[in-house]
């Protein structure tokens, strides 16, 4: 009996790695449905190979004529609202949320309330509305297994340890493409340089986030909500080799770390198979081949966005939501060559300073905070353009 999987964000790097796992285990999993934003050619390729029941094209500007309303046996749905329809399908058992950005929030909530098992790779969901998501997970008794490599590593470690023995959890980070660049040279970083990452092959937005360690800041906030750990018990270390993905420090002074070859198939396979063990070797990487492992504290002058994430997380309420939305809006400006790489955290800081922090009870209130933050970034940019004239 195969398990039916709904994959949101099939054309991205996490989506492609998920398809690798499904491809390797056809006896265990069936791709019931998937979504793409606008990559229609990729959708055709996946449909031809897996023949799912449904495809959702979430972009409002997609050319409906390319796929039509049906492709073979596969029904084609359009628009962001259809993402929620996909995850609510009765046959779906596991939902993998690999969509980047706050657009993943509503379908994630739909999966939780529909009682699906959730493999969560969309960190923005917990960052933007963590308290709300936590309450829904508890209310619906939803099984959530994180798909991010660091959170999945910590999930596996914490699952095997006595909670009373844990002192601190540590997220590892490669440090990105600019970890050894003199700080004074960060002001001249180009878009082409910022779109390169030394370890992971990812989409443009998450690559830029990673190179400024803002991505790690988002992961800190996500870890707080996933594991119910206070911020002063969450640490970050730079680990250039990207072999250790998570570390748990114990109260007796000992530590456990989770290590594997840096490949997303490990956390994805674990998320899909959990609580069963993954039945075969994904990629052997014995300790004798690791070489030297380095760990060092991050420099907050080099990575101001990481410090801002800790601050926003500790403030709580809508502060993490504003942090995330301001970052998304600032990265968009950077990708359009309208601001410099080092200005991204400046826009986040100024947006957090301008907006009053609220403590919402509803999804709509979080979404309003998100909207206001994006609008504030655009207004800040417009004011700076005027003042420069």
UniProtKB/Swiss-Prot annotation:
The keyword Oxidoreductase applies. Mn(2+) binds at residues 148, 150, 219. The keyword Magnesium does not apply. GO terms for biological process: isopentenyl diphosphate biosynthetic process, methylerythritol 4-phosphate pathway involved in terpenoid biosynthetic process. Its EC number is 1.1.1.267. 1-deoxy-D-xylulose 5-phosphate binds at residues 123, 149-150, 174, 197, 210, 215-216, 219. Its cofactor is Mg(2+); Mn(2+). SUPFAM superfamilies: 1-deoxy-D-xylulose-5-phosphate reductoisomerase, C-terminal domain (SSF69055), Glyceraldehyde-3-phosphate dehydrogenase-like, C-terminal domain (SSF55347), NAD(P)-binding Rossmann-fold domains (SSF51735). It is an enzyme of class 1 (oxidoreductase). Pathway: Isoprenoid biosynthesis; isopentenyl diphosphate biosynthesis via DXP pathway; isopentenyl diphosphate from 1-deoxy-D-xylulose 5-phosphate: step 1/6. One of its GO terms (molecular function) is NADPH binding. It catalyses: 2-C-methyl-D-erythritol 4-phosphate + NADP(+) = 1-deoxy-D-xylulose 5-phosphate + NADPH + H(+). Pfam families: DXP_redisom_C, DXP_reductoisom, DXPR_C. NADPH binds at residues 11-14, 39, 122, 124, 203. Keywords: Isoprene biosynthesis, Manganese, Metal-binding, NADP, Oxidoreductase. HAMAP family: DXP_reductoisom. Catalyzes the NADPH-dependent rearrangement and reduction of 1-deoxy-D-xylulose-5-phosphate (DXP) to 2-C-methyl-D-erythritol 4-phosphate (MEP). Belongs to the DXR family. This is 1-deoxy-D-xylulose 5-phosphate reductoisomerase. The lineage of its organism: Bacteria, Pseudomonadati, Spirochaetota, Spirochaetia, Leptospirales.
């Amino acid at each position: 009996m195969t398990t039916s999987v709904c994959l949101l964000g099939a054309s991205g790097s996490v989506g492609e790695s998920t398809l690798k796992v499904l491809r390797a285990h056809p006896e265990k999993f069936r791709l019931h449905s998937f979504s793409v934003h606008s990559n229609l050619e990729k959708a055709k390729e996946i449909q031809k190979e897996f023949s799912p029941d449904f495809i959702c094209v979430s972009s409002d500007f997609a050319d409906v004529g390319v796929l039509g309303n049906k492709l073979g046996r596969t029904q084609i749905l359009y628009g962001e609202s259809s993402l929620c329809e996909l995850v609510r399908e009765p046959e779906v058992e596991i939902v993998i949320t690999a969509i980047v950005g706050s657009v993943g929030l509503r379908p994630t909530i739909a999966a939780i309330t529909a009682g699906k098992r959730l493999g969560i790779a969309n960190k923005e969901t917990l960052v933007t509305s963590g308290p709300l998501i936590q309450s829904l997970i508890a209310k619906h008794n939803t099984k959530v297994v994180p798909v991010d490599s660091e959170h999945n590593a910590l999930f596996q470690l914490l699952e095997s340890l006595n909670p009373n023995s844990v002192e601190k959890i540590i997220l590892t980070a490669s440090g990105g493409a600019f970890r050894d660049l003199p700080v004074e040279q960060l002001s001249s970083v180009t878009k082409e340089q910022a779109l390169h990452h030394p370890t992971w092959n990812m989409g443009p937005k998450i690559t830029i986030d990673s190179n400024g360690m803002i991505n790690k800041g988002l992961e800190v906030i996500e870890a707080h909500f996933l594991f119910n750990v206070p911020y002063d018990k969450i640490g970050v270390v730079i680990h250039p080799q990207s072999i250790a993905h998570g570390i748990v420090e114990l109260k007796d002074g000992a530590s456990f770390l989770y290590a594997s070859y840096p490949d997303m198939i490990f956390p994805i396979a674990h998320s899909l198979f959990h609580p069963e063990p993954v039945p075969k070797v994904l990629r052997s990487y014995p300790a004798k081949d690791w070489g030297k492992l380095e760990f060092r504290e991050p420099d907050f002058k080099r990575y101001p966005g990481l410090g801002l994430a800790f601050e926003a997380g500790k403030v709580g309420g809508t502060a993490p939501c504003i942090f995330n939305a301001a970052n998304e809006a600032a990265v968009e400006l950077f990708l359009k060559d309208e601001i410099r790489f080092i200005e991204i955290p400046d826009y986040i800081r100024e947006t957090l300073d301008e907006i009053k922090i609220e403590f919402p009870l509803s999804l709509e209130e979080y979404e309003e905070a998100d909207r206001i933050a994006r609008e504030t970034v655009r207004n800040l940019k417009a004011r700076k353009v005027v003042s420069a004239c």
